[in-house]
């Protein structure tokens, strides 16, 4: 455990500048409200309850003046109508949701400053070119295909959640040594929990906080996942003869490239890389090769070797998490399976290894003999059952996959209905373009196409057949033409391509920075 503490201390570069005084500067809140931060890596426009610019500025000034007062304090009041901030020093109040959002946005800007400076200095020091292709979620699957072909076992681990907010503050304290800022953050989180305690259950408090304070919670949650990842990296380095220089580089990219731009909080992505991506240098290990990937609250550990060695990795990771975060980690959250007979759900795909056997006849002089060879193939499939469940929740079909009309869209025009359904189909095709087999994707698109026809027919109080006859082939063009044109440009001209056929060409795009909404619901 002493080696773990030493590794964590060495991996963190403690930030010394004081950030708390910046909390009283108006420009910090201006930056949080889409004024001058568009070029920032962390840019994300925010809106607060429909207040105009003048009203927001006046309330922010009032908040700053109130914080300046020595005897000023805030606490929640259980009001029968509205939950409000109350200032006893000024005897005035503002809505708690506005102030909580303003403070959380100010905190988010402040805590991001040292990390953004650290990222820029790290790239300059290492002379690493910015590769924006690593932002794409699809860039993960070629990595998995390259690594998993040589591994034996895979373990599904559920990263412990929800995490207590005090642990989030303690994690941030390891990176930022501004005591006043951390005390104020702890005070803010504690009061926010009290404000909502009479409205929601404790289990839902973090969820509500994450919905109303997305930027701050995303940063705190990413910090927590970062600590979990450091433990995995620590385990990996303990089994290596040589130090792995690629770890620090890729984790930096994951912190700031992959997860910040328009990625939802719960869809965090990690790949622990056991080789240098850009130099192509391979390393040797004392233990069999291990690769790890994590998304949302699930982590996947894959390893070569025996079942006992694979269980050792999972056991060590669980023990380190328990020791470091001070919680009990249930053993049932870890599942060990053999890759050749197991499909794991990861980022909207069902991934597995297929063994293809082939027999080759070898002729040597007058003797001939047969050679049986077995090769592994990494297969990614569309999770049809999961997607049908998502469509059922969204009221596009029944639980069994029977298409139904979308009643909430009944007031839209035909063009708007077709455009929405067509956009859903195009997004699905774009996201699941890496599927080994497209039959499942065609089934999902058929459900959406028929649901579109029934929704439009219901608005005209007619039948689907009448609506389809009146519309003609326009419905099919809206759903399929764009995808067919894109694939015809990508695939070689020598490859015969029929859209309605069962082609097996896998295409990974480098512009996908968020998980499809239907995949989220599943």
UniProtKB/Swiss-Prot annotation:
UniProtKB keywords: Chloroplast, mRNA processing, Plastid, RNA-binding, tRNA processing
Subcellular location: Plastid, Chloroplast
Cellular component terms (Gene Ontology): chloroplast
UniProt xrefs under InterPro entries: Domain_X, Maturase_MatK, Maturase_MatK_N
GO molecular function, one term: RNA binding
PANTHER family documented for this protein: MATURASE K
Purpose of the protein: Usually encoded in the trnK tRNA gene intron. Probably assists in splicing its own and other chloroplast group II introns.
Protein name listed in UniProt: Maturase K
Organism expressing this protein natively: Iris sanguinea (Japanese iris)
Gene it is expressed from: matK
């Amino acid at each position: 455990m002493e080696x773990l503490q030493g590794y964590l201390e060495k991996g963190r570069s403690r930030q010394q500048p004081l950030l708390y005084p910046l909390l009283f500067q108006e420009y910090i809140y201006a930056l949080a409200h889409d004024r001058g931060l568009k070029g920032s890596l962390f840019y994300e426009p925010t809106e607060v309850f429909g207040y105009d610019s003048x009203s927001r500025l006046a309330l922010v000034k009032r908040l700053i003046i109130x914080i300046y007062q020595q005897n000023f304090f805030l606490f929640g009041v259980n009001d029968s109508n509205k939950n409000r901030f109350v200032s006893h020093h000024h005897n005035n109040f503002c809505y708690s949701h506005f102030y909580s959002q303003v403070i959380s946005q100010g905190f988010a800007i402040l805590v991001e400053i040292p990390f953004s400076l650290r990222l820029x200095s790290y790239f300059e020091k290492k002379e690493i070119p910015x590769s924006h292709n690593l932002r794409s979620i699809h860039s993960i699957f070629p990595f998995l295909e390259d690594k998993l072909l040589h591994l034996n076992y895979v373990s599904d681990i559920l990263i412990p959640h929800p995490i207590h907010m005090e642990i989030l503050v303690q994690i941030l304290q390891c990176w930022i040594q501004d005591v006043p800022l951390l005390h104020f953050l702890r005070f803010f989180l504690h009061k926010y929990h009290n404000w909502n305690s009479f409205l929601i259950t404790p289990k839902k408090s973090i969820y509500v906080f994450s919905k109303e304070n997305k930027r701050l919670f995303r940063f705190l949650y990413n910090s927590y996942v970062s600590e979990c990842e450091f433990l995995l990296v620590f385990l990996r380095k303990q089994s290596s003869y040589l130090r792995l220089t690629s770890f620090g580089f890729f984790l930096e990219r994951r912190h700031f490239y992959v997860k910040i731009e328009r990625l939802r909080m719960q869809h965090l992505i990690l790949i622990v890389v056991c080789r240098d991506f850009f130099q192509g240098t391979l390393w040797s290990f004392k233990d069999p090769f291990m690769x790890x990937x994590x998304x949302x609250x699930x982590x996947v550990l894959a390893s070569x070797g025996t079942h006992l060695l694979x269980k050792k990795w999972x056991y060590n990771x669980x023990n380190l998490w328990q020791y470091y975060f001070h919680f009990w980690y249930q053993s049932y959250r870890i599942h060990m399976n053999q890759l050749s007979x197991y499909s794991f759900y990861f980022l909207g795909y069902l991934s597995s290894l297929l063994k293809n056997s082939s027999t080759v006849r070898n002729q040597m002089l007058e003797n001939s003999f047969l050679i049986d060879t077995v090769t592994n193939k990494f297969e990614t499939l569309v999770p049809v059952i999961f997607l049908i469940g998502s469509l059922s929740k969204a009221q596009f079909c029944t639980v069994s996959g029977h298409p139904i009309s979308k009643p909430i869209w009944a007031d839209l025009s035909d063009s708007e209905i077709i455009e929405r359904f067509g956009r859903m189909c195009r997004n699905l095709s774009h996201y699941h373009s890496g599927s080994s087999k497209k039959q499942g994707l065609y089934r999902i698109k058929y459900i959406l196409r028929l649901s579109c026809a029934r929704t439009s027919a219901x608005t005209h109080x007619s039948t689907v057949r009448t609506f389809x006859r009146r519309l003609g082939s326009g419905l099919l063009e809206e759903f399929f033409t764009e995808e067919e044109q894109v694939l015809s440009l990508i695939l070689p001209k020598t490859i015969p391509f029929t859209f309605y056929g069962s082609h097996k060409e896998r295409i990974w795009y480098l512009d996908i920075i968020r998980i499809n909404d239907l995949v989220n619901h599943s």
